[in-house]
Amino acid sequence: MTKERTFIAIKPDGVQRGYVSEILGRFEKKGFKLVGLKQLIPSKELAQNHYGVHRERPFFGDLVDFISSGPVVAMVWEGEGVILSARKLIGATKPLEAEPGTIRGDLAIDIGRNIIHGSDGEDTAKFEINLWFNEEELCEWETSDSKWRSEN
């Protein structure tokens, strides 16, 4: 496997409930490298672009309003298989269907307040990273323990 990048966002409910450090810790403990991090209150335009795939769905307006209602912690994580692994760490979209031990399984109850967003594939990850971050906001660096994280 080659190193890849994914976009992760802690939604306003996760920030307000104080889960930022716990979520960061789960990704770090898994062995992924944080290469982009910022906190912002997204504009309606950014939220609409991010969730554009849902534009025709009945919940789109409420979703945009929610995401732009408070601070979001936007992140880019890097590592081997990070997209699929992040999806497993996050858990099912519906928290009541998410396995215990996942972020949503442990911390969320309602689908409308499910704490976190993660890219669902390579193309989506590239789109979302480019939407939320400028290239100069991403940090290229090597961890001092990289040889202990993977054979590659």
Curated annotation (Swiss-Prot):
Its cofactor is Mg(2+). Major role in the synthesis of nucleoside triphosphates other than ATP. The ATP gamma phosphate is transferred to the NDP beta phosphate via a ping-pong mechanism, using a phosphorylated active-site intermediate. It holds the Pfam family NDK. This is Nucleoside diphosphate kinase. The keyword Transcription does not apply. PROSITE patterns: NDPK, NDPK_LIKE. Keywords: ATP-binding, Cytoplasm, Kinase, Magnesium, Metal-binding, Nucleotide metabolism, Nucleotide-binding, Phosphoprotein, Transferase. Its main location: cytoplasm. Its EC number is 2.7.4.6. It catalyses: a 2'-deoxyribonucleoside 5'-diphosphate + ATP = a 2'-deoxyribonucleoside 5'-triphosphate + ADP; a ribonucleoside 5'-diphosphate + ATP = a ribonucleoside 5'-triphosphate + ADP.
